[in-house]
Amino acid sequence: DQIGKAEALWRSADMYLNTQVAEVWERTCCSGICSMDNRIMLRLAGTHTIHQAKAVTDIVYDLCSTDSIFQHNDIQRRFQDIHVIAQHMQGIPEIYSIVGRHFLGLPVNSHLV
């Protein structure tokens, strides 16, 4: 059941990200500008996808048990990489706060958008 859960998490995040990128691309090509709404939607989709990828990697890492800790195991490198990416500015929890402020009509003064 964990592999099925991981697959569902990944596929839904991947579809969400690709849908948002396509929609923003189309709107930007039509208008010639990437609006704040578009930038917010891209940030949200990107951050969400990072955290879902981290959750998927954690599931697989746990399933591999102690084999996961060895450098010759590919999952170890992927585990390390996704945890680093989640700490990058694109993956930080503050993104959700910024998006929430935007959706509530509150000012967003951030270089992260």
Describe each model-derived feature in a short phrase.
Residues 26-43, 68-84:
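Charge-rich, acidic-biased intrinsically disordered regions
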Residues 37-68:
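Charged, glycine-rich active-site and insertion segments that engage polyanionic ligands
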Residues 4, 18, 35, 62, ...:
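Catalytic cores of transferase enzymes with a strong primary signal for eukaryotic protein kinases
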